[in-house]
Amino acid sequence: MDSLTPELLAPYLRIESEHSIRAANEFTKEVLDFYILGDEKTGYELPWPILEDKFRLRAGECTLLGGINSSGKSLVLGQMALVAMTQGAKVLSVSLEMSPRSQLIRLWRQSSTSMTPDIDFGLLFNAWCKDKLYFFDKEGSMDMDTLEAGIRYSIDHFGTDLIMVDSLMTISGIKNDDYSAQKDVVCRIADMVRDLECHIILVAHARKSFSIRDKLDRFSIRGAGELTDRVDNVLLVQRTYNDDPDDPDVTFSVSKARHWDMAECDLDLWMDQASMNLLAQNQKAVKLLLDDEDLDA
C-alpha cells in the first residue's frame, strides 16, 4: 500500500470540499421537518419532566457537563443514561474514573429505587440493558485517538447513539493549563457528533473557587475558554450545602443551549437517599418495570 502522503490525499480532500458546498434548497426537507413535524423536539428527555419541552439530548450535538469535585456529575450521568435507555437510547459509557462494576452497582439502585435491590431485579436489569448499555472497559486514561476509535467502533458495531465521556482530564496528554490540547479534544468531539449523528456528553471540572457556595456558570469551567464555546450545550451540577433538610440538595443548570430557545434555567433538585436519584419538587422516584421476558430476549 502506498504511503498516505499529502499529494495522495489531495484529490480526496477536494472531493470532500465539493460535497460540503450545497445549495440552500437541498436542506428544504430538514427545515420542513423542523416546522411541520416538530423536529425541534427530538432527542432524549432528561430525568426531570419540567425540562421536556425546554431541552433534550439531540443527535448531532455535544454537551459539556460541569461541576466541582463530588458535586454529583457521575450520579447525574447514570440517571440520564437510565432515562435515555427507557426511550430507546443505546449508551456507551466511557468512564475512566469509575469501573463498569461500580457503575452497575449504582444503576441497580437507581433503577430499583431501593438501597438494597434484590438479586432477581438486578439480573432482570442486566438482561434488559444487554443491548442498550455498553462500557469502554478501561480505567486510568486513554489518548484521544483511542477514544475516537472506540466511539466509532461502538456506533458501527452496536448502534450506540449516546456517548458519555467521564472525564476530560482523563484523556492522556492533557494538562490543566494545556489549553491547546483541550481545544483540540473538544473540537474533535464536536466534529464527531455531526459526522456520526450521535450525542456526546463530556464531563469537565469547575475551577476551584474561594467557596463551594459560589454560584457556577459556564465561565466557571476549568480550562480553555473554547471548551464551552465549541460545545452546543453546557449543563452544570452544583451542591447547595443547605442547612435546612427541606431545602434542595443540588442545583442543576442549563447554562447554554445553542439550538434551543430560552432553555437556560436553574432547577432545584432533592436527593432521594434510597435510590440515589435527584428529583425535582413533587417528583417521585419511579422503579423501572421489568419482566421475565427480558431474561429470554
Give the predicted meaning of each segment:
Residues 179-188, 217-221:
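Charged helix-capping and loop-helix junction motifs
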Residues 3-10, 19-28, 144, 148-163, ...:
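C-terminal regions of RecA-like/P-loop NTPase motor modules
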Residues 96, 205, 239:
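Cofactor-binding loop segments of dinucleotide-utilizing enzymes, especially the Rossmann-like FAD-
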Residues 164-165, 198-205:
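Structural recognition of the conserved hydrophobic beta-strand(s) that form the central parallel beta-sheet
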Residues 56-58, 84-87, 126-128, 153-157, ...:
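Conserved catalytic network of the ASCE P-loop NTPase/AAA+ motor domain
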